[in-house]
Amino acid sequence: MSNGKRGRKAKPTNKEKDMIFTPGCVDCHMNHLPFQCPRPVMTKKLPEWEKKSIGMGKLKNPLDSKVKMYSEPARQTTWKEKLSQLNHENMSYNAHNKRSSRQRGNSYRLPQQNIPPPSHHQSSQVMRGFQNAPFQMQPHYNNERKPQSRRNDTMRASKSAYAAATAPVKKHVRPANEQHMRKLNDLLRPFSYGSDDLYEETQPFVKETSLANVDIQICQTRPKVPPGKMWIFESRTIYDENGNCVSAREGAMEVSLASRMHNEPIVIVSMNDSMCF
């Protein structure tokens, strides 16, 4: 018969209640924590059990070997070890090869790769001959195993029936009729501003390029100049020293001919031969 006291924690005595934990340093026995100790690490004395765990029990000066242990850098991996790590990552990433890696190692599937060590003083360049064919991407091995592969056949219009059903309907647009477009150009004037009284129609002419449609006559519309006046159009373009356009401004000026003398000439200079007289 058990008295029911097994496994129960004993009640703390008055001595344990009065005890208060005060943090102290192991090395200098002060009231700060061990990582706050101002003494350097190398001057601290190691206990015997720590010397044996490190392997410095038989040494005369254990601090020398500790400095040597901390000062030696880690060994860098060679190019062969890096190559084996990359091959292991690539083989473990593929789900098809992961199934076979449980039974036999990944090196069973890997062919022998003779890769020379990298040389930093010379850059390796791939030289292709003139008669060699260009590089072509090979298809994935999953496409070769599928009997319903569509690599050599026409591709599907959509991946799913829902995407095909919800696709936007494209309207079939017929090519514009040339005769119909020319009639629209006659009706819709290219320069429309103000009322019809400000415009005049010139004599119809036929373009030299459209010899097939000689019966179609195109009337040209241009602004009507008031009597006794003339318009002067000017355009200013400012370029910087590099030849880039900074600003371009166009303007028109109306000149009254009645205010001038009868024999006073008007000289208009066109730099780009865009004005026709």
Curated annotation (Swiss-Prot):
Residue stretches of biased makeup (Basic and acidic residues): 142-156
Source superkingdom: Eukaryota
GO biological process terms held by the UniProt record: embryo development ending in birth or egg hatching; P granule assembly
Bias kind Polar residues: ranges: 103-113
Keyword tags: Cytoplasm
Gene ablation phenotype (knockout): RNAi-mediated knockdown results in embryonic lethality in 5-8% of animals. Surviving animals have enlarged P-granules in the germline.
Region called Disordered, residue ranges: 95-158
Keyword Cytoplasm: yes
Tissue: Highly expressed in the germline.
The keyword Signal belongs to this UniProt entry's keyword annotation: no
Subcellular location: Cytoplasm; Cytoplasmic granule
Record's GO cellular component terms: cytoplasm
Function summary: Plays a role in modulating RNAi activity and P-granule accumulation in the germline. May function in association with CSR-1 complex components such as drh-3 to regulate RNA transcript accumulation in germ cells.
Name of the protein in its database record: Enlarged germline granules protein 1
Organism: Caenorhabditis elegans
